[in-house]
Design a protein with these regions (language model features):
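Short basic alpha-helical hairpin corresponding to helix-turn-helix/winged-helix-like nucleic-acid-binding
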Residues: 58-114
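Short, amphipathic alpha-helical interaction segments positioned at domain boundaries
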Residues: 77-82, 168-205
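Short amphipathic alpha-helical interaction segments
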Residues: 37-45, 130-148
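Minor-groove-contacting beta-hairpin "wing" of winged helix-turn-helix DNA-binding domains
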Residues: 63-67, 159-167
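A short, conserved structural fragment
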Residues: 50-58, 143-158
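Short, positively charged loop/turn segments that connect secondary-structure elements
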Residues: 117-137
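Eukaryotic partner-binding/assembly regions in large regulatory complexes
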Residues: 1-76
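An N-terminal structural lobe/cap that precedes and organizes the functional/catalytic core
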Residues: 209-211
Length: 211
């Protein structure tokens, strides 16, 4: 292991430990450097963090993240259940709104409003999931949730004077997570679906270090 290659390790660790992704499409200059560093020598970073912290660095197609450890205890199971339920809900809503939703697509608030206007079923889903009572409220909340989950990045389009939200590689993480979960029985599948609403989430900063 060449320790000279690990100069970004402390900053990246804090970021990944918060439940965040480091994506190829990142617009933040520091995160671009981090992604390039991981691409150049991710094995060294993975080995260093595994030895010093026990965390496992995993990578997908254009993104890196800390893989969650599932030990079989009830708390870990509840965390998986919460993640699975949240991911399914969000991905299902996005595909209801726009079946062409994918990595690289650029969305806006006006996109969200147009999709909601054209989809009464999605409106009912938003009425249940989000605060507020109008399509404008739900569009704002949807964008906020997409940013929370890091499904989108953001930048200001100066010509249109509108914030653009390009879809990041993290979206593929959620789809893959859902597609690769396999249940050994219908009872276990139901227990995941019925997991407590207040179960910890991958995106809670305070819980990430306990995985």
């Amino acid at each position: 292991m060449d320790l000279n290659n690990l100069r970004f390790a402390p900053q990246m660790f804090r970021y990944l430990n918060g439940g965040h992704f480091i994506c190829a499409s990142a617009r933040n200059e520091d995160q671009k450097k981090w992604f390039d560093a991981l691409e150049a020598g991710w094995e060294d970073y993975a080995e260093a963090w595994r030895k010093t912290t026990g965390f496992e660095l995993a990578r997908g197609d254009g993104y890196y993240y800390f893989r969650k450890k599932i030990t079989g205890d009830n708390r870990s199971f509840e965390k998986v259940a919460a993640d699975y339920r949240d991911y399914c809900t969000m991905v299902d809503l996005l595909y209801r709104l726009d079946q062409s939703f994918c990595v690289g697509k650029v969305v806006t608030k006006s996109w969200a409003l147009q999709c909601l206007e054209a989809n009464p079923a999605a409106q009912e889903t938003c009425r249940t999931l989000f605060k507020g009572t109008t399509k404008n409220d739900w569009a704002d909340e949807l964008i906020e949730q997409l940013r929370k989950y890091e499904i989108v990045d953001s930048f200001m389009n100066e010509e249109q004077y509108e914030i653009y939200y390009p879809v990041t590689e993290a979206f593929d993480y959620y789809r893959t997570f859902i597609e690769t979960i396999q249940f050994s029985s219908k009872e276990i599948e139901k227990s995941v679906e019925d997991a407590p609403e207040d179960a910890p989430s991958l995106f809670e900063e305070s819980g990430a270090a306990e995985e």
